[in-house]
C-alpha cells in the first residue's frame, strides 16, 4: 500500500513524533510511506520522505494514497490536524483519549481570541473573540449537552484544571474518520461506546529490543557523575507534572535519609525548567538529581540501562499507552507504575503498582522493596522484557496496522 502519515516528526516535543518514526520503520518494505508535517524543521535521518502538510492534497491528486493515517494526540504539536482530518479523510490513530485541551486550543487560542487578549479595549476584537468562544461552546454542547459553560470556565481557571480529564472530548477528532486505532483496551472500549459505527483496532506499539554494548551503563553514569555505588531511580520521557515528579522527588528525599547513595535521574525533555528547578530545590534533592534534557535514541537507551529502578507514574492521565514505559520494560528494568485502568493489561508480575490514593507512601515502599531484593528486581525486569517482546514487537505492529488499514467491512 501507498500510505500518507500525518504526524509531528522529530524534533517536535511529543513522544508521538518518535513513535511515528518507529511505525514507519515497521511498515517499510511491504508498504511505501510518505510523511506530512506542520513544522519549520524536521530531523534529517527519517525513514521516509517528508513534506509540508499543505502538499498532501497535491500529492494525493497526482497519485492516490491507499490510506491516510493521522497520528493524533493532546499536545500542541498535533493541533494542526483538525482541519486536515476533515479535509482529507483517513484513519485516526488516537494516542490520547483526552483531547479536550487540544480541541479547546482551536478556539480559545485562535487568532481572534489572542488578538482580543492583546487589546481587550477593542470592541471589534471582542466580537470576533466572542464568536470563537461561542463556536467552542457549541462544539462542547454537541458532545456534552448542558455542560458547555462549565467546561469553558475550566479553561479560564475558574473551576480547576482536572475537569477536562473527566470530559475527554475526543469525538470531534473522529468525526470524519474511516476507522480508528488505539493502544489499550480502556481506550478501545470508550471509543466503541461513543462511535459503534467505526471499525476500531487495538494496535501494538513498535518497541525495538536494544542490544547495548558492554559498559554502556557505566559510561553513561561516569559521564553524568553517577558512581557505581549509587542506587539510581530513573524517570524517562517528557518531564511533566503529570508524571508525578514531585512525588518521586519526595520519595527519593525520604529514602536518602536512610540511604544517602540514592540518586534521581530525569532523562528526557523538560516541559518547564523553572518549575522543575523549584521542585527539586523545595524537595531537597537538587544535589542528588541528574537532569539530561532530550537525548537521542542511543543515549536514551544508555540512560535506561543506568537506572536501578524506574518510576513511571501518571495523574491525571489522558489514558494513553506510554511508549517510554514500554521502552524501559524492553530493556528489562524493574518499573513502578500507577495503578490505573488504562494500564490494567500489563501483567501484575511484570511491574509494581502504586495506588494513587497512597502515592508517595506506596512509592517509597516499592522502591525500598526493589532495593532490598535485587534478585526480584532483575527477575521482574526479565518478565517485563518478555512481555514487550511478545506484545509490542515490530512484527505485531505491522500486523495490527495492516488490520487497521484494510477496507472496512460492509455494515
Task: Put a short name on every predicted segment.
Residues 101-102, 160-200, 207-209, 345:
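A short, active-site helix/loop in glycosyltransferases that binds the activated sugar's phosphate group
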Residues 276-301:
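Nucleotide-activated donor-binding/catalytic signature segment of Leloir-type glycosyltransferases, i.e.
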Residues 40-41, 236, 263-277:
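Glycosyltransferase donor-sugar binding loop
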Residues 212-226:
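A short helix/loop element that forms part of the nucleotide-sugar donor recognition site in Leloir-type
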Residues 238, 376-390, 397, 403:
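A short, well-ordered alpha-helix in the C-terminal region of glycosyltransferases
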Amino acid at each position: 500500500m501507498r500510505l500518507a502519515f500525518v504526524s509531528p516528526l522529530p524534533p517536535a516535543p511529543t513522544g508521538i513524533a518518535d513513535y511515528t518514526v518507529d511505525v514507519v520503520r515497521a511498515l517499510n518494505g511491504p508498504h511505501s510511506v510518505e510523511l506530512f508535517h506542520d513544522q519549520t524543521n524536521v530531523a534529517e535521518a527519517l525513514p521516509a520522505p517528508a513534506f509540508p502538510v499543505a502538499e498532501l492534497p497535491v500529492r494525493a491528486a497526482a497519485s492516490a494514497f491507499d490510506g491516510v493515517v493521522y497520528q493524533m494526540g493532546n499536545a500542541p504539536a498535533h493541533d494542526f490536524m483538525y482541519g486536515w482530518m476533515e479535509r482529507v479523510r483517513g484513519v485516526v490513530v488516537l494516542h490520547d483519549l483526552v483531547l479536550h485541551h487540544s480541541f479547546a486550543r482551536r478556539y480559545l487560542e485562535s487568532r481572534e481570541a489572542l488578538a482580543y487578549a492583546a487589546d481587550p479595549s477593542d470592541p471589534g476584537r471582542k466580537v470576533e473573540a466572542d464568536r470563537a468562544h461561542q463556536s467552542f461552546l457549541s462544539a462542547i454542547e454537541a458532545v456534552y449537552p448542558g455542560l458547555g459553560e462549565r467546561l469553558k470556565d475550566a479553561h479560564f481557571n475558574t473551576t480547576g484544571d482536572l475537569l477536562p480529564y473527566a470530559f475527554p472530548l475526543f469525538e470531534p477528532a473522529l468525526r470524519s474518520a474511516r476507522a480508528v486505532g488505539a493502544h489499550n483496551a480502556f481506550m478501545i472500549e470508550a471509543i466503541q461506546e461513543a462511535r459503534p459505527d467505526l471499525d476500531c483496532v487495538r494496535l501494538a506499539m513498535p518497541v525495538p529490543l536494544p542490544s547495548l554494548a558492554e559498559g554502556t551503563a557505566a559510561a553513561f553514569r561516569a559521564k553524568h557523575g553517577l558512581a557505581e555505588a549509587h542506587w539510581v531511580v530513573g524517570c524517562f520521557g517528557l518531564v511533566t507534572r503529570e508524571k508525578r515528579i514531585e512525588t518521586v522527588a519526595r520519595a527519593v528525599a525520604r529514602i536518602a535519609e536512610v540511604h544517602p547513595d540514592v540518586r534521581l535521574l530525569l532523562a528526557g525533555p523538560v516541559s518547564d525548567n523553572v518549575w522543575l528547578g523549584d521542585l527539586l530545590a523545595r524537595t531537597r534533592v537538587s544535589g542528588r538529581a541528574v537532569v539530561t534534557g532530550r537525548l537521542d535514541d542511543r543515549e536514551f537507551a544508555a540512560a535506561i540501562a543506568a537506572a536501578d529502578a524506574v518510576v513511571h507514574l501518571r495523574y491525571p492521565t489522558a489514558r494513553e499507552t506510554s511508549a517510554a514505559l514500554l521502552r524501559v520494560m524492553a530493556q528489562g528494568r524493574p518499573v513502578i507504575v500507577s495503578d490505573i485502568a488504562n494500564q490494567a493489561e500489563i501483567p501484575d508480575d511484570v511491574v509494581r503498582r502504586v495506588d494513587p490514593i497512597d502515592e508517595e507512601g506506596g512509592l517509597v515502599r516499592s522502591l525500598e522493596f526493589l532495593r532490598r531484593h535485587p534478585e526480584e528486581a532483575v527477575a521482574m525486569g526479565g518478565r517485563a522484557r518478555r512481555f514487550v517482546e511478545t506484545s509490542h514487537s515490530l512484527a505485531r505492529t505491522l500486523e495490527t496496522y495492516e488490520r487497521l488499514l484494510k477496507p472496512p467491512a460492509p455494515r
